[in-house]
């Protein structure tokens, strides 16, 4: 009997060379879903018919090898061999025999053959589709594999994967920001919390939860230079590499909005053709499943102007050619291919307009680089690890610039400048602090490569470039035609020179249109336009384009008058750059480098403008004080800033970012005439609770005006997210502003390092801080030595709140060293909830007997216990003790400590306020206190006994106290189960003429209607008595 291998070889021998090659090709690509193993090409290349049969059986066994051959005969259209092999199929087992006999009937063979041809046809179509996708992915991979640096020479490029550094992304609803160019406000506090809300790229289009609708539109928002375009290109590359959206989208099309916004009509099919590797893409087949397509639109804000004119026009036909902005508008509004997905990048300026076009979009904010990613970027940029380490160390030392490097564009500029310095062998000097300084340095490095351009010609080119930039800013224009260049004295050949310098680049796909390589460069040169002058017949004038009279009429005064009026703030960065450029050292540097004349008149105009704005009332179109501070900070010239800050009678700003802290610190330390200073978190609201009602906390916000000087002396920075690294510059203002006497830093994570910086400032002779609040500042015992040094060296500090900091007993021991010092003049001290135990009470007791200035001590919410209070009471009986108010709220006390407190009430006539809320004293404890309260030397005015486990058994003692104690004015008894009879009895006592109580707080009690009526009757009969009660039924 002939073996299966020989039979199979005989069939293969009937194949001619062409068919045998086809057979091998199908054998290599055999569908895996059929359960057989494809034979590798390398083992089939030189195999003859016998070798091939052997390989098929070795890989899959006889039965599967035969089935593979039968299927491939059909695939290569050899029906004769297919029918013969079907009829000649060996008997494998009973099941197969039965099956074989059934399918070998002539009718069955015919039906099976036709069905198999249909299946193979469908397989062919799918394979063609896969071939299209595979070819397009290869094209996208090739197109987006590399990027060009802005300063790259011809032919130079950088591998995108090796340079790309991960950006932080968070889901966020769009905010109604009025300013487009607030680059520095992107690094805000939530950036530190972003791991909790960060979004992974692969989840961009996933629903929020299992019940939500899928997401079809995603909007990436971020300021200029934050990395929107590079992220969009990375998404394209990762998709092409099969790393992203592999099973979600068959096609991703990258659209440059500024290119599509041109007036040339085009259809959606034309857009796809422009993305395809050859001129004949299968558009119909691509658009057959729009849900498998993602359009990635980069730079929506760059076509905003065009949208204004044609927002109502719609295109629904993918073959119809329309204006580019109408085409994109139709895609965005889901009028064209409504089932397709969109990913749009934009600056915040265009968010409001974009929002009206979208239906349920997901907004994702790009926050830039985290601190760790900044370091990663440096090490990726510099191929030499030693250079990377040196550059990163330098930037880290300049904290302001390191902060700015969260913006990828700034990071690139800084790295470029440092690398050029390294390559020339120059030592790395202290890097500049501001955006202007970074751009000036970058421009100077570009000028080194200006080639053979003559000096006077270059000056003309630069002037034309600056006027072009300014004209574009005023008209909100970023794409320029050749006629625009000619209007500003520039020729096509001139632009080539700038292309070599990478300041002004020619568009690759739009040959007749030109743009600045980045919007911020256009803003920088627009600011320079207002500074460049030339000598004309003995007079210095500002030079401008001959055909642009409108721009000549828009001088610095007009620029500043319009600053703040533009709804979207297009002039903000231009004015900031203007301030930065008039720095005298920078002006001299530019005049030398550019061989040009810089206007000095602009400095006077800017100072006059600041003076007017500093005194102006708050109006919607007025720039905020913080924005003015940003302008002054950009200048980095302290004499000018001091002159400007003299015009601010009142400073009231909200801080929300790190740069806000840095900028405000720089300006405030140069401010010597301010009368009111108020700094706060944007969402901060004042806490208006009484000090006594708090039973141990000062106000979180204080606005105190001394009547003799009429100068506000309060500064509050509550919940400003200050950290220790931002404190040094801010605290330096404490030594220069002598009118500042109150400082509230509550709810800021200063930590011990920040506290150390603050203590250095507090010990400065020029510092006049008297009241300092540091609640919830993340302090530990390690800072207590520094605080103790302040207490022992400064007699000005009279009030200190350290509540809600884990100082511990050891921290209090260190603190008490300063409190016992002869120079310590502290009067009020809050140590509420500081992780204290009875072990600290001995140290505090020694303070009470030696410090004669301390009159208020609040140490509640600590586990002091009865033993701790007993130790304190021993020293409070000392005649030298001047303590007036003691807060022991929720301190784990029982009736055991009440005898010691009674002794204090009997002996210390200075003692007037005692807070015992939330301690289980019980009726026994009150009975013991009653003895002290009835003593003739007792001068207590305020007694707080809320939630102290009192019952109706305390009624007689309470009545006795109210009747015989003539000093007590306020009594709190809330949240005690006194009962109706006791309360009614107290009402009768309070009606007596000898009772001098002014305030009775009963809080929440279970009282009946009769008791309520008794309280109301008492209130009417004795209006000078305030009764606060809340009845629970």
From Swiss-Prot:
Domain Pyrin: start-end pairs: 1-91
SUPFAM superfamilies with a match to the protein in the record: DEATH domain, P-loop containing nucleoside triphosphate hydrolases, RNI-like
Impact noted for substituting residue 754 to A/R: Increases interaction with NEK7
Location in or out of the cell: Cytoplasm, Cytosol; Inflammasome; Cytoplasm, Cytoskeleton, Microtubule organizing center; Golgi apparatus membrane
Effect of mutating residue 291 to A: Abolished phosphorylation by PKD/PRKD1, leading to prevent NLRP3 inflammasome activation
Lipidated residue numbers (S-palmitoyl cysteine): 126, 834-835, 841, 955
Classification via Pfam families: FISNA, LRR_6, NACHT, NLRC4_HD2, NOD2_WH, PYRIN
Sequence positions bearing Phosphotyrosine: 11, 132, 136, 145, 164, 858
Record note on disruption phenotype: Knockout mice are fertile and appear healthy when housed in a standard specific pathogen-free environment. They do not exhibit any increase in serum IL1B after administration of R837 (an analog to guanosine and TLR7 agonist) and/or LPS. When challenged with LPS, mutant mice are partially resistant to endotoxic shock. Mutant mice display impaired contact hypersensitivity, a T-cell-mediated cellular immune response to repeated epicutaneous exposure to contact allergens, such as trinitrophenylchloride.
Key word Cytoplasm present: yes
Residues spanned by motif KFERQ-like motif 4: 988-992
Location of the region described as Required for binding to phosphatidylinositol 4-phosphate (PtdIns4P) in the Swiss-Prot/TrEMBL record: 127-130
Biological classification of the source: Eukaryota, Metazoa, Chordata, Craniata, Vertebrata
Activation and inhibition: Under resting conditions, NLRP3 binds ADP and is autoinhibited. Inactive NLRP3 forms homodecameric double-ring cages that hide pyrin domains within NACHT-LRR rings to avoid premature activation. NLRP3 activation stimuli include extracellular ATP, nigericin, reactive oxygen species, crystals of monosodium urate or cholesterol, amyloid-beta fibers, environmental or industrial particles and nanoparticles, such as asbestos, silica, aluminum salts, cytosolic dsRNA, etc. Almost all stimuli trigger intracellular K(+) efflux.
The name this protein goes by in its record: NACHT, LRR and PYD domains-containing protein 3
Chain positions recorded as ATP binding sites: 165, 222-230, 518
Domain FISNA: 136-206
